[in-house]
């Protein structure tokens, strides 16, 4: 079973449809989590300032807004915005919607195995910045496809990890690996996917409409055979 969610997105009026293809073998449904506001000094939890680059995703379930970070991930932002302005994302699909993990799209082929870049489709390198983490709501460039680590391209995802996903054991592991107390506290409050921090690139963060992202992740889906 597949459900189309028609969407208009971003900074130059990018429009595309989200076709949700689940990751489980049977149809499943979930209830969107309740997310409290996170009080943190981490930049990803600050409201955008004048002059910040904002991505606006207008979907049939509501609007999502994300601030982009060209200072920390210049190539990821340049590629995303360039492709959006060119119309590349028009009528592409969200091929992965996994509750408590992520919703992912950006492959014009709709399979998750392809992608494009503004550099004649040549991939760009990983941009891992210690000031940006895979907190819930992070907008990320996907580098791992089919179990292989690839260069960056058009594929992106929103982290939908649950608020309680980073438990005390994982918090201690983060401290042991040099994460600051502020970052550990942010992960504990927001939830996230810290094991992806040096694997994929974070280039934005949802600051409005995370409830919409969660609704997309909760749409009943079945495995796309």
Residue ranges of predicted features:
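Cyclophilin-like peptidyl-prolyl cis-trans isomerases
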Residues: 14, 22-225
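Sec-dependent N-terminal signal peptides of Gram-positive bacterial secreted proteins and lipoproteins
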Residues: 3-25
């Amino acid at each position: 079973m597949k459900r189309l969610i028609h969407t208009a997105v971003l900074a130059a009026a990018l429009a595309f449809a989200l076709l949700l293809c689940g990751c489980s073998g049977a149809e499943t449904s979930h209830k969107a989590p309740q997310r409290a506001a996170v009080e943190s000094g981490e930049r990803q939890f600050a409201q955008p300032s004048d002059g910040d680059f904002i991505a606006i995703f207008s979907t049939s379930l509501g609007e999502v807004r994300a601030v982009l970070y060209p200072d920390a991930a210049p190539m990821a932002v340049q590629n995303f915005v360039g492709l959006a302005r060119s119309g590349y994302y028009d009528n592409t699909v969200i091929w992965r919607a996994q509750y408590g993990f992520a919703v992912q799209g950006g492959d014009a082929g709709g399979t998750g195995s392809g992608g494009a870049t503004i550099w004649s489709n040549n991939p760009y390198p990983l941009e891992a910045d210690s000031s940006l983490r895979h907190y819930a709501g992070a907008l990320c460039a996907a580098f791992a496809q089919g179990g292989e680590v690839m260069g960056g391209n058009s594929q992106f995802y929103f982290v939908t990890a649950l608020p309680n996903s980073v438990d005390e054991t994982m918090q201690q592991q983060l401290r042991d690996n040099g994460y600051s107390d502020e970052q550990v506290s942010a992960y504990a409050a927001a939830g996230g996917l810290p094991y992806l921090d040096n694997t994929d690139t974070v280039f934005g963060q949802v600051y409005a409409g995370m409830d919409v992202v969660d609704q997309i992740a909760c749409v009943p889906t079945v495995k796309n055979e």
